[in-house]
């Protein structure tokens, strides 16, 4: 009789040898594009709020300072005209919003996933795990199930559905994908973040900060993560070296979201940028001390662009050169704040720009990098990345 394996031998056989690696990235947006310069007039007109002249001026100033050039939104003028309750400030409208997002969130996620799978170049039957993240709507079975059906993934694919996480979750999904890939030899994890603002859009009110209406946009991003890539058929982009999550001290209530009959309402304290910048150096030190790195300009940066004030204050706090946030600011400008999807858009922009600009690595010529997610809690996700050489 053959000797049975020990638990230790089983565990060793189950685990990958090397670090989790991003093997492909895909992004998608709705077709409807709105330009920030035109948005205040459009927003106050469609919500029948032109009589609020002072509030409109305030909103115009916010849009002017947002550093956003354009955003993409599933909600068109026609959809909003057909759903007047979504244009009111606090009218019951959850059913209408849900009816939109439970269909459109998986659909937009599918578009991003198809691009990632095409770049990866392997049969989708090799996908072993699916992580789906959205802050837009809730259903059972969830968007993970819908996407599995849409893409024709194996029924045995291991799914994880993340609802209502918010803007830090682009870091969360990478942390989870890293653990899944490294603890399951041969695993290939499809990660999808799909966000549609149909749950948060509402008319203006003097009691509302209007920050969300000025910043949020729609988008979906997908990555494929696996360890021990077969470099004859797979092309690594970034290695996921470490990942952590923390709740910032004295930050309770700084960002809250509440799903109610009126949709998803957001409440933000003015000091969110200050709270993040005050704690950013500690997060960097905790992540990079084991690597002997303490020059924050020597690493590439992918930071969730919650808004321009956050980026400005983080830059000032750690004396960052302006070019470190170039990819981050580009995505903010061209897409707005797409919640969890943003950092994956920035990762995509960085590897493309690195190749176009003739850099030697996917991280703007640098070896080490950091990815930050900021969101409700205040919660901060910190992911340490290692770039790979740029290949033609």
Curated annotation (Swiss-Prot):
Keyword Acyltransferase: yes
Reaction equation(s) it catalyzes: (E)-4-coumaroyl-CoA + 3 malonyl-CoA + 3 H(+) = 2',4,4',6'-tetrahydroxychalcone + 3 CO2 + 4 CoA
Keyword Nucleus included in the entry's annotation: no
Coiled-coil stretches noted in the UniProt entry, renumbered to this chain: none
Catalytic center residues: 167
Domain of life where this protein originates: Eukaryota
PROSITE patterns named in the record: CHALCONE_SYNTH
InterPro entries: Chalcone/stilbene_synt_C, Chalcone/stilbene_synt_N, Chalcone/stilbene_synthase_AS, Polyketide_synthase_type-III, Thiolase-like
Any GO BP annotation: flavonoid biosynthetic process
Pfam families assigned: Chal_sti_synt_C, Chal_sti_synt_N
Alphabetical keyword list: Acyltransferase, Flavonoid biosynthesis, Transferase
Pathway: Secondary metabolite biosynthesis; flavonoid biosynthesis
EC number from the UniProt entry: 2.3.1.74
GO molecular function: naringenin-chalcone synthase activity
PANTHER family, A to Z: CHALCONE SYNTHASE, HYDROXYMETHYLGLUTARYL-COA SYNTHASE
Family stated for the protein in its record: Belongs to the thiolase-like superfamily. Chalcone/stilbene synthases family.
Function: The primary product of this enzyme is 4,2',4',6'-tetrahydroxychalcone (also termed naringenin-chalcone or chalcone) which can under specific conditions spontaneously isomerize into naringenin.
Name of the molecule in the record: Chalcone synthase 1
């Amino acid at each position: 009789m053959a000797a049975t394996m020990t638990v230790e031998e089983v565990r060793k056989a189950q685990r990958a040898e090397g670090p989790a690696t991003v093997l492909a990235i895909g992004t998608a947006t709705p077709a409807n594009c709105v330009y920030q310069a035109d948005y205040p007039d459009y927003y106050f007109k469609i919500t029948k709020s032109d009589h609020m002249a002072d509030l409109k001026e305030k909103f115009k100033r916010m849009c002017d300072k947002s550093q956003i050039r354009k955003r993409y939104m599933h909600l068109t003028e026609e959809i909003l005209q057909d759903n007047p309750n979504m244009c009111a400030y606090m009218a019951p409208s959850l059913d209408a919003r849900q009816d939109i997002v439970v269909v459109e969130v998986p659909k937009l996620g599918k578009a991003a996933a198809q691009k990632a799978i095409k770049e990866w170049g392997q049969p989708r039957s090799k996908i072993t795990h699916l992580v789906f993240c959205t802050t837009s709507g809730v259903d059972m079975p969830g968007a993970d199930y819908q996407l599995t059906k849409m893409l024709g993934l194996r029924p045995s694919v291991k799914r994880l559905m993340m609802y209502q996480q918010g803007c830090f979750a682009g870091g969360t999904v990478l942390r989870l994908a890293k653990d899944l890939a490294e603890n399951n030899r041969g695993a290939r994890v499809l990660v999808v973040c799909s966000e549609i603002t149909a749950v948060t859009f509402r008319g203006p009110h003097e009691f509302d900060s209007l920050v969300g209406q000025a910043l949020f946009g729609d988008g979906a991003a997908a990555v494929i993560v696996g360890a021990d890539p077969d470099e004859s058929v797979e092309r690594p982009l970034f290695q996921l070296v470490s990942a952590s999550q923390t709740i910032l001290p004295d930050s309770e209530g700084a960002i809250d979201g509440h799903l109610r009959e009126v949709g998803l309402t957001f409440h933000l304290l003015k000091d969110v940028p200050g709270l993040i910048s005050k704690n950013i150096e500690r997060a960097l030190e905790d992540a990079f001390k084991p690597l002997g790195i303490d020059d924050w300009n020597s690493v590439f940066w992918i930071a969730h662009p919650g808004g321009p004030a956050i980026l400005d204050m983080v830059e000032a706090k750690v004396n960052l050169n302006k070019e470190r946030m170039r990819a981050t600011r580009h995505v903010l400008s061209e897409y707005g704040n797409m919640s969890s999807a943003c950092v994956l858009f920035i990762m995509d922009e960085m590897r493309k720009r690195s190749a176009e600009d003739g850099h030697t690595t996917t991280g703007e010529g640098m070896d080490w990098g950091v990815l930050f997610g900021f969101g409700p809690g205040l919660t901060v996700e910190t992911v340490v990345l290692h770039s790979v050489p740029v290949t033609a």
